[in-house]
Amino acid sequence: YRRQRQMCIRDRYGAFGLKPGTLNGEILLNLDSEDEGELYIGCAGGMDVTATLEYKEVAPEEGDVAVKVTLKGLRGGHSGLEINEGRANANKLLVRFVREAVASYEARLASWEGGNMRNAIPREAHAVITIPAENEEELLGLVKYCEDLFNEEYSAIETPISFTAERVELPAGQVPEEIQDNLIDAIFACQNGVTRMIPTVPDTVETSSNLAIITIGEGKAAIKILARSSSDSMKEYLTTSLESCFSMAGMKVEMTGGYSGWQPDVNSPILHAMKASYKQQFGVEPAVKVIHAGLELSLIHISEP
C-alpha cells in the first residue's frame, strides 16, 4: 500500500488525466496537507533535462595506471524539500577533483557513475581515471587534500565525507581528450541547487536544479537533471540555461516530463477567508506554506484556470 501510494503521489495520474471543463466551480480549496494547521498555497513545477553524447573510446597511454576514486557518506535527500539546506552534491564535488587532476597531473577520464534518482540529491559518486605512473603519489595527495577540504566546507551541514582512491585494472578505453574536457567543463558549470527564492514568500525556494545522475563510459555519456520552479517563466529560464550549458559541450539535450508550477498568491481573497475561518475554529493562525515539490493543484490549475 505504501509503495502504491507513493507512486500515485509522485506521478499524479489522476490530475494529469483531468479534462478541461470537468469542474464547475470557480474557487478551489487545497486541503492536501500532511500536518494539521498548515495551508499550502503554491508548489513547484518541474522538468527533466537529459544530456547525452556518444563517442569513440581511445586507448590509455603506455605507462599509465588506473585509479578509482570514490566519494561517499553524503546526506543526500529530496531534491525539492531539502535543496535549500545547502547539502553537498556528490557529482559537483567529484568534478572539482577531476578537473584539477586533469589540469595538474595529466589525468584522463575513463568512466564516471554518480547518483541514481532524479529527485534525490546524489550521495555517492565514483570515477576511474588514468594517469602517468610517476604522478600517482601526487594524485593521492590531491585526494586527501580534497577530502579534508570538502569536510571543512560542509562541516556544519554534512556527516563526515569519505573520499578514497584505489589502484584498479587499466581500462581498455577512455574518453577522448577534447570530449573529456568539454564534459568536465559542462558538469563544472552546470547550475545546481537554489537559483532563486520566492519574492513574496522569501523563506521558500522558487527555482532550483539538481545535477542528479551522471554516467560516462563505454562510449556513452548521460547527464540527468531535475529542474523545479513555482514560476513557469523561471523554469523556462533555468532549463534553457541548462540546455545551453550542455549544448556547448556538443551534447544532445532533451526536455521531458514537464509540468507547471502553482505560483502562490498571498493576496488571494479565499486565502484570507480560510485563515480567518481556521482561527475562528481553532483559536490560532494557520501556517501558510509553499512546497518546493509537485502537488496536483498545479495541474488542476492549468486544466481549470
Segments predicted by a language model, with ranges:
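Single conserved hydrophobic/aromatic residue that forms the stacking wall/gate
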Residues: 1-9, 301-305
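Beta-strand segments within the central parallel beta-sheet cores of soluble alpha/beta enzyme folds
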Residues: 3-6, 109-112, 255
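Midchain, well-structured core segments that form catalytic/ion-binding scaffolds
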Residues: 16-228
